[in-house]
């Protein structure tokens, strides 16, 4: 495994660990999810260029589009939760609460 692949795998693993550890605040969870998506984007682009699979060259762009949509929905949810509750705790996302 080359050092670039190892660094990207470590970055993805650290972002995943951040999602699992810092899941009390929505903003920190969203930042860790963005780190995961960016490391996946770079890994996918490098693998496509390394193996010369140019028929799948649009896959990283599609992943980036879905990542931007996820960020937009997450920030809209963050604004709505902070307007309603005054904080960004993930426990406020429970829809079964009255």
UniProtKB/Swiss-Prot annotation:
Q: Which is one GO molecular function term here?
A: NADH dehydrogenase (ubiquinone) activity
Give one GO biological process term: ATP synthesis coupled electron transport
Report the membrane topology from the UniProt record.
Multi-pass membrane protein
* Compartments reported by the entry: Mitochondrion membrane
Give the source's domain of life in one word. Eukaryota
The record's disulfide annotation reads: none
Alphabetical list of Pfam families matching this protein: Oxidored_q2
Class of the enzyme per the UniProt entry, highest EC level: translocase
* Family under the similarity heading: Belongs to the complex I subunit 4L family.
Q: Which PANTHER family match?
A: NADH-UBIQUINONE OXIDOREDUCTASE CHAIN 4L (PTHR11434:SF0), NADH-UBIQUINONE OXIDOREDUCTASE SUBUNIT ND4L (PTHR11434)
- Name of the protein: NADH-ubiquinone oxidoreductase chain 4L
UniProt organism field: Phalanger vestitus (Stein's cuscus)
What's the name of its gene? MT-ND4L
